């Protein structure tokens, strides 16, 4: 059986004692490569199945103070006024050729009402009422669709209904759904588009900076491995958590930012330290020693950094707002997964690559 305690290849190390706890973790990872790789593969694949649903399942709502008078008043409106609260959906029907109470306008209003009645998330439906939701010339009216579900579910209802409602428009009658639920639905879509666009722009730039920083293409790819592992695991976890408690879409936004930032920082610490240790102790036995030294030094700094971030963010969980708690929770999840990947997956990859970490090095770079 192979010992997990590496011995320095020469007396140049100046270290007479064995590796510390993190150093032993690093050598244990090297001795159990298949197990560690298998666990991470199962984790990423298992959670990755749910990750694509993150933008649809998570909600942009939740900007409220639980227990406040405003939330209590909204709940009373939902209970006693047929769901006619802030999360209700309003459908504006406007006719360019006469009243919405007769002719084609009335037909469209009836179609809007029928479509809303088929959705179980909609409570009481109120057609355009004179003096309230009907203009003086009767050319424009508002169909009120009360909220029959919580705010997050009403955002999903708005997402499902808005295209069907808009499709009821004719050449002379225009149908436009609106309200806070529609606002958050549109925001989620704009947020997804902006996030994808920003990632397409930032990742190539990030890779170029990493290549310059590490001096080699292979070494530059390691932070991206940590980032992807943390992102996929975080996204899948958020979707699963959302089945138990509502999670805001902001959680994924901040999780992505922190996963990228910490993935780069943590990988930079470990890769630079490992390359220095291997340069000081070349040879086959130097791999285990370099991993142990890297984990006992840079690994310790990374662990303390991650724990500090987690402790700092835990205070945000006390804020009585679902959105703020979701943001803190998303960041904490990304930190946990990136930290776990840094302390287990990265040592495995470093030991496996060894000198190949400098492959495709820049001509002017130095290890």
Regions found by a protein language model. Give the residues of each.
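Membrane-embedded transmembrane helical bundles of large multi-pass transporters/channels
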Residues: 1-57, 122, 149-367
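Structural beta->alpha junctions
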Residues: 93-104, 145-153, 178-182
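Sec/Tat-exported extracytoplasmic proteins
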Residues: 81, 85, 116-120, 165, ...
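Extracytoplasmic
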Residues: 71-72, 98-146, 163, 186-189
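Solvent-exposed, non-transmembrane loop/terminal regulatory segments of multi-pass membrane proteins
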Residues: 23, 51-90, 94-96, 181
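Soluble periplasmic/extracytoplasmic beta-strand elements of cell-envelope proteins
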Residues: 88-92, 142-146, 174-176, 269
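Residues at beta-strand starts and edge strands
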Residues: 85-87, 139-141, 333
């Amino acid at each position: 059986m192979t010992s997990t305690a590496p011995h320095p290849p020469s007396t140049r190390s100046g270290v007479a004692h064995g590796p510390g706890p993190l150093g032993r973790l690093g050598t244990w990872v090297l001795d159990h490569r298949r197990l560690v790789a298998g666990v991470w593969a199962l984790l990423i694949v298992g959670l990755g199945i749910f990750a694509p649903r993150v933008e649809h399942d998570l909600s942009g709502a939740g900007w409220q103070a639980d227990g406040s008078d405003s939330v209590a008043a909204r709940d009373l409106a939902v209970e006693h006024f047929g769901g006619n609260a802030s999360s209700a959906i309003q459908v504006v029907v406007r006719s360019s050729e006469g009243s919405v109470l007769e002719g084609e306008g009335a037909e469209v209003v009836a179609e809007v009402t029928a479509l809303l009645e088929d959705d179980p998330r909609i409570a009481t439906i109120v057609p355009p009422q004179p003096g309230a939701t009907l203009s003086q010339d009767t050319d424009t009216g508002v169909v009120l669709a009360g909220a029959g579900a919580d705010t997050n579910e009403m955002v999903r209802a708005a997402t499902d209904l808005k295209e069907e409602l808009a499709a009821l428009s004719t050449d002379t009658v225009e149908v436009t759904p609106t309200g806070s639920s529609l606002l958050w639905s549109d925001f989620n879509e704009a947020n997804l588009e902006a996030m994808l666009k920003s990632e397409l722009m930032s990742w190539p730039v990030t890779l170029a900076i990493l290549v310059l920083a590490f001096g080699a293409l292979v070494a530059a790819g390691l932070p991206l491995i940590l980032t992807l592992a943390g992102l996929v695991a975080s996204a899948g976890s958020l979707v699963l958590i959302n089945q138990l408690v509502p999670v805001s879409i902001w959680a994924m936004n901040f999780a992505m930012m922190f996963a990228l930032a910490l993935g780069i920082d943590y990988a930079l610490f470990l890769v630079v330290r490992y390359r220095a240790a291997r340069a000081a102790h070349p040879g086959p036995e130097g791999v285990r020693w370099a991993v142990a030294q890297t984990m006992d030094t840079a690994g310790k700094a990374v662990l303390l950094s991650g724990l500090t971030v987690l402790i700092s963010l835990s205070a945000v969980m006390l804020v009585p707002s679902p959105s703020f708690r979701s943001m803190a929770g998303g960041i904490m999840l990304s930190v946990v997964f990136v930290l776990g990947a840094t302390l287990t997956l990265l040592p495995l990859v470093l030991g496996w690559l060894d000198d190949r970490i400098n492959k495709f090095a820049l001509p002017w770079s130095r290890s």
